[in-house]
């Protein structure tokens, strides 16, 4: 009897296991991607002429920009005839490895854009439709939007709207966000928008349960109108559009815990700033991204940083650590930012202090291989970071 029961159980198990579709047990791990951006940002002609050499670097794509046509709130009409040479150049880029490229839009309000001026916004909408064509021409996955205002700030309140309630201005900004994304989707119905930061910027107010108190706290923040704009973008996003909070704050992380907390902030806590009817859409179409700031980890900045109190070997370990945990915690994209180095020009063509630091490429590759192979990082930086902080504190005392 026992033998018959065993055979019966074995047969049932075989049938049961055999009934599972192969793709339930043989799925590949989600592939994470690293894209490069920095002061070495390139233009379409450089990319076209150097794409084979560029693709030797350990990235999945780049964030680059068109000449002159790159400010979202430019109220001057863009003419396709003026942009056409760059559209042609974009179309000539023969990418192979770099399948995840983004064209950049900046948010500086250098032309006195008015959220309530329909003439301004009719122009901006047409400009963004043309920019959408540029994105498609270059076979880019989408747009990189930098909301930081390097000039006149469009996100302030009251600013020039002292005669209007905050709710009135926020609703208008939300409307413009809808129009903005709709225009960008004109030629790219399945668009990816990588923003250097979104609602994760407001992590210190999202846990306030009282909506009125939370709004009062928001009014004291930098870029107070930004949440309204992003809610408009979310509202107008087509089903195939992905919106990425790039979490620029990760520039300064010195522990794994900070990466994990940031992911939870973006994916969960930040939804306090999202209207209830949009939260299901937020969960479906907003991703958490992560950022790397090489200058910060390799002591290349002119301001004092923890990394300046680490040895060169420790600095590379610090960078590898951040690459590893950025890949671990991003939904899909990590953007790698640098200022005082150039990934694309040979050493003889850049200033001495802009040459790519020795070991940085190897550290990035090492972190990526460990992540992709499901291996642990293999070391902890807590001790060396604490020692560096003590040295830094001792210097100040």
Protein language model annotation of sequence segments:
Residues 21-26:
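Boundary at the C-terminal end of the N-terminal hydrophobic targeting segment
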Residues 27-397:
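Glycan-processing catalytic domains of CAZymes
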Residues 9-19:
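Bacterial N-terminal signal peptides
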Residues 1-5:
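Positively charged n-region of N-terminal signal peptides that target proteins for export
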């Amino acid at each position: 009897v026992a033998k018959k029961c065993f055979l019966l159980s074995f047969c049932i198990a075989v049938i049961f296991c055999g009934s599972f579709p192969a793709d339930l047990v043989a799925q590949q791990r989600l592939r994470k991607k690293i894209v490069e951006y920095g002061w070495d940002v390139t233009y379409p002609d450089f990319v076209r002429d150097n794409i084979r050499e560029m693709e030797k670097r350990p990235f999945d794509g780049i964030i680059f920009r068109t000449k002159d046509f790159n400010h979202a709130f430019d109220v001057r009409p863009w003419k396709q005839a003026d942009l056409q040479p760059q559209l042609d150049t974009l179309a000539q880029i023969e990418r192979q490895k770099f399948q995840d490229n983004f064209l950049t839009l900046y948010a500086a309000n250098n032309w006195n854009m008015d959220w309530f001026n329909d003439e301004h916004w009719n122009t901006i909408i047409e400009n963004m439709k043309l920019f959408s064509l540029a994105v498609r021409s270059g076979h880019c996955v989408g747009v990189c939007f930098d909301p930081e205002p390097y000039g006149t700030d469009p996100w302030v309140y009251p600013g020039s709207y002292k005669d209007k309630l905050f709710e009135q201005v926020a609703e208008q900004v939300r409307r413009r966000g809808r129009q903005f994304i709709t225009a960008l989707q004109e030629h790219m119905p399945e668009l990816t928008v990588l923003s250097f930061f979104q609602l994760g910027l407001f992590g210190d107010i999202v846990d306030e349960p009282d909506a009125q108190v939370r709004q009062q706290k928001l009014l004291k923040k930098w870029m107070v109108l930004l949440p309204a704009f992003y809610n408009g973008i979310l509202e107008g996003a087509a089903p195939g559009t992905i919106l990425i909070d790039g979490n620029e704050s990760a520039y300064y992380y010195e522990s794994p815990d900070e990466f994990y907390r940031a992911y939870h902030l973006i994916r969960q806590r930040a939804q306090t700033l999202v209207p209830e009817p949009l939260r299901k859409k937020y969960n479906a179409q907003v991703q958490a991204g992560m950022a790397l700031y090489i200058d910060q980890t390799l002591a290349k900045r002119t301001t004092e940083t923890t990394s300046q109190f680490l040895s060169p070997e420790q600095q590379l370990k610090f960078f590898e650590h951040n690459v590893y945990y950025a890949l671990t915690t991003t939904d899909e994209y990590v953007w790698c930012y640098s200022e005082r180095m150039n990934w694309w020009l040979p050493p003889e063509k850049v200033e001495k202090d802009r040459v790519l630091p020795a070991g940085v490429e190897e550290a990035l590759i090492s972190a990526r291989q460990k992540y992709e192979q499901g291996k642990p990082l293999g070391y902890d930086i807590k001790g060396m970071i604490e020692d560096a902080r003590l040295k830094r504190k001792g210097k100040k005392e």
